[in-house]
Amino acid sequence: WASQVSENRPVCKAIIQGKQFEGLVDTGADVSIIALNQWPKNWPKQKAVTGLVGIGTASEVYQSTEILHCLGPDNQESTVQPMITSIPLNLWGRDLLQQWGAEITMPTPLYSPTSQKIMTKMGYIPGKGLGKNEDGIKVPVEAKINQKREGIGYPF
């Protein structure tokens, strides 16, 4: 599972005790939270001994009485003892994200900032091709090693 940061929220599915849930990936949450209206009525829960901070005013906060088996978005085995409260959507916190091996990466730019500034001053628009109609190649040409040492610059 991968998600690029955009106007859409990073949402993924997980299977807890055989039941599928969809939730928001929330690296700022210490624990995972299941929406009270999605918590199965026959699954045991208890009043939480600690409150939840950062999600507004939650009047009723529960926690699963059991540690539950969970499969992540790519079938990663994990366990969770989620909190349960009245929120609009489920939150996958770091308790699950760590077990799933979640990473946040920022790609290294293909070109240096200096070369990007030069290209921009010359009229280059990122994502567009080079040329009068901006229809040229959009990705760099890869250099290929000539193992046979034939062609331009090599004797025949």
Curated annotation (Swiss-Prot):
Q: What is its EC number?
A: 3.4.23.50
Q: From the Swiss-Prot or TrEMBL record, give the protein name.
A: Endogenous retrovirus group K member 21 Pro protein
Name the family the entry cites.
Belongs to the peptidase A2 family. HERV class-II K(HML-2) subfamily.
* Keyword Protein biosynthesis tagged: no
Gene Ontology molecular function terms on file = aspartic-type endopeptidase activity; nucleic acid binding
GO BP terms: proteolysis; viral translational frameshifting
Segments forming domain Peptidase A2: 21-96
Q: Which controlled-vocabulary keywords does the entry list? A: Aspartyl protease, Autocatalytic cleavage, ERV, Hydrolase, Protease, Transposable element
Class in the EC hierarchy, top level: hydrolase
Q: Which domain of life is it from?
A: Eukaryota
Query: Where's the G-patch domain?
Result: 111-156
Describe its function.
Retroviral proteases have roles in the processing of the primary translation products and the maturation of the viral particle. Endogenous Pro proteins may have kept, lost or modified their original function during evolution.
Q: Which reaction does it catalyse?
A: Processing at the authentic HIV-1 PR recognition site and release of the mature p17 matrix and the p24 capsid protein, as a result of the cleavage of the -SQNY-|-PIVQ- cleavage site
Q: Locate the active site.
A: 26
| Family matches, as Gene3D superfamilies | Acid Proteases
Which species is the source of this protein? Homo sapiens
Keyword flag Hydrolase: yes
Q: How does it assemble?
A: Active as a homodimer.
Q: How is it modified after translation?
A: Autoproteolytically processed at the N-terminus. Expected C-terminal autoprocessing not detected. The sequence shown is that of the processed Pro protein.
For this protein, the record's Pfam families field holds: G-patch (PF01585), RVP (PF00077)
